[in-house]
Every structure is written in C-alpha cells, then in structure tokens.
A protein has these predicted regions:
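One-carbon transfer enzymes
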Residues: 1-168
Length: 168
C-alpha cells in the first residue's frame, strides 16, 4: 500500500533489500553495515532529496547516513519511551506496567530513536478493554507467560492492536 501511495503522489521511491544484501555477503550483517549505508546513500544521491522517510527500514542508521540526509523515522513509542522494534517496545511497556504508549515521527540521529520529534500521538493502554488483561498479568509470572505465549499473549496482542490502529 505504501509503494502505491508513493507512486500515486509521483514521489521517487528507493528500495534496497537488506536481506538480499546480507545473503550476497556471507557473515554477520554488522560486518557490512557501513557498506549497506553507502549503497543506500549512493541510491539516494541521484535524487538530491530534501527529506527521506525510513518507512519499514528496521535497521539502525549509521552516523554518516544521518549526516548525509534528513531522515524521518517512524517509531512505535512516545518520545523518550522505549527504543527498539515494535515487538521490543511492547515487551518493555508490559514489563514497566505502562499506562500509555504512542507513536512518533522523529529525525533519525546517531542516538537511536531519540532524535528531534516532529509529531507524536498518545495511546492509552490501561482501563477499558485493557483492565482485565493487566489484572490477569498481575496474577501470573511475566517471564513464564512470555516464554509460553510469546507475542500471542492477549495483553501483547491488545497493545499491538491499539498501536496499529493509529499507524499510517
């Protein structure tokens, strides 16, 4: 859907599969991280973009990349909230017994998920349909639930659903 929307607006779209890049170079991706960023920067340079959007990028952007272009990152947490993937964020929210979460758009910097905030929204994750799920968690061991149910845990699923409803 995102690709179609970008095309509909006549915007240039640059994609470079990190999975294919990894497979083409044996060994840990960390060994090729800067090479990948360089390839992305080279792909973008022909467009001379005013701004780039890291939609679904799911990689930590290196410093040289952050300095080369203004990069908007979509992050599934409030400013100064949990960092990491959406899955990591949800587990951190559960572990800390958070009452709210959210999503933000921020400028990517070398300080992962902490760049200047452009916009954000807040999502309540307590009371209402969440109350019983938090009460259930209070009666059980989170480590055991996480091991046995993982992302299928009802509270995890409900938080994801609440966040997903607000994603573009």
């Amino acid at each position: 859907q995102y690709f179609a929307l970008v095309q509909e607006y006549g915007l240039p779209l640059v994609t470079l599969s990190s999975a294919k890049f990894r497979r083409a170079r044996n060994g840990p991706f960390a060994n090729h991280r800067e090479d990948y960023d360089l390839r992305v920067r080279d792909s973008l340079s022909r467009f001379n973009p005013d701004i780039c959007v890291l939609a679904g990028y799911m990689l930590i952007v290196g410093g040289a990349m952050c300095r080369a272009y203004p990069l908007l990152n979509l992050h599934p947490a409030l400013p100064q909230g949990p960092i990491g993937t959406w899955q990591e964020v949800i587990w951190q929210l559960i572990e800390s017994r958070s009452t709210h979460t959210g999503a933000m758009v921020h400028l990517a910097t070398e300080d992962v998920d902490r760049g200047p905030v452009v916009s954000y929204c807040t999502v309540p994750i307590s009371g209402g349909s969440f109350a019983g799920l938090w009460e259930e968690l209070d009666r059980q061991d989170l480590a055991r639930l996480r091991e046995e149910q993982g992302e299928e845990m009802p509270l995890f699923q409900r938080i994801r659903q609440a966040e997903y409803q607000r994603e573009p």
